[in-house]
Amino acid sequence: MLKTSEKIFSETPSIITKEEGLKILNGVIPLTTCLDKAFQERNRYFENKVRIHILDNIKNGYCPEDCGYCAQRKNANSGVQEYPMKSEQEIYEDAVQAKKNGAYRFCMVTSGTGPNRLTTEKLASTIQRITDELNMKVCLSAGLLDIEKAQVLKEAGLDRYNHNLNTSENHYSEICDTHTYLQRTQTLDSVSKAGIGMCSGVIVGMGESFQDIVDVAFQLKSFRVISIPVNFFIPVKGHTIKNPSVLTPELCVRILCMFRLINPDSEIRIAAGREGHLRSLSATALFAANSLFSSGYLNVKGSEILETVAMIRDAGFVPELSNGEILPENFGTESFYSEKNFPELYKFKKF
């Protein structure tokens, strides 16, 4: 075992092979060795900083797609509250709250196959207002996208678009049959051609093999994806995943290490399922990942911001703000929310 570990992690920097990725997931390499090497790469590109992302579910339900993992899919009978797209003012106020909560990036998510022209223009207007008035980094996840719509969003100031591959091409037909894997990769191609940074990741635990997880990690590398959210499957009411995988905290950390070592300079983000699957190893996972979500997910609650910040600091890391500065020590206190610290917020909204 030691010889195997030394062979895999002897060079710095190193991009591991598919075979080596499988050895990480299969437990051949000691977890501490995986973490040590993953942290070397994480620290090389991101130092001791952690980026907190906050999601805003701007439209819930009314989705014609049949993604088996999703509570919003058609005919899900999941009991989620459906609502149409929020107004620009509602989304803006959510962005204000995200900035107050120390978000590095504000992530807008809408259900559906993809936006039409009118919806794209509405989203563009909202994005431009948030970036201009709040000076925030924004990510949008709105489904399938062509190059023309991507260019509209780019001109509005969008610098990141999320469209997850979710799993390998080989496994994709097992989780969705209303659109293809090719359509997803074509969306990434449109985003790239428009000059928008690509955010694309996975949901592990949907009955895929270790080979599937390794394959999609390399697929994301081939697209040069700069932000990779790693979700751990949550069996929400109404899902149709036939054989969900058993995810232990150790395996989840190994998966994050593998993604880091295949995509060393990408932002690796701990996404949905952190609280339930990583559990006591949530802080340990930050030695591989440099980003996470806080304050909940689309239809599932998550850790609140103060708890998240405390975990980050307890592990020896520091939360990074969108302007590159570090979240002040007085975060969460009245003095932190002063007009001196947030002049742009007081300019547009009285607190």
Curated annotation (Swiss-Prot):
Record's keyword annotation contains S-adenosyl-L-methionine: yes
Cofactor(s) it depends on: [4Fe-4S] cluster; [2Fe-2S] cluster
Reaction(s) catalysed (UniProt annotation): (4R,5S)-dethiobiotin + (sulfur carrier)-SH + 2 reduced [2Fe-2S]-[ferredoxin] + 2 S-adenosyl-L-methionine = (sulfur carrier)-H + biotin + 2 5'-deoxyadenosine + 2 L-methionine + 2 oxidized [2Fe-2S]-[ferredoxin]
Co-factor note (free text): Binds 1 [4Fe-4S] cluster. The cluster is coordinated with 3 cysteines and an exchangeable S-adenosyl-L-methionine. Binds 1 [2Fe-2S] cluster. The cluster is coordinated with 3 cysteines and 1 arginine.
Biological process per Gene Ontology, one example term: biotin biosynthetic process
CDD domains assigned: Radical_SAM (cd01335)
Main EC class the enzyme belongs to: transferase
Keywords: 2Fe-2S, 4Fe-4S, Biotin biosynthesis, Iron, Iron-sulfur, Metal-binding, S-adenosyl-L-methionine, Transferase
One matching Pfam family: BATS
UniProt xrefs under InterPro entries: Aldolase_TIM, BATS_dom, Biotin_synth/BioAB, Biotin_synthase, Elp3/MiaA/NifB-like_rSAM, rSAM
Pathway(s) this gene product operates in, as recorded in its UniProt entry: Cofactor biosynthesis; biotin biosynthesis; biotin from 7,8-diaminononanoate: step 2/2
Keyword Lipid metabolism: no
GO MF annotation terms: 2 iron, 2 sulfur cluster binding; 4 iron, 4 sulfur cluster binding; biotin synthase activity; iron ion binding
Subunit details: Homodimer.
UniProt-recorded name of the protein: Biotin synthase
Organism the protein comes from: Leptospira interrogans serogroup Icterohaemorrhagiae serovar Lai (strain 56601)
Gene transcribed to yield this protein: bioB
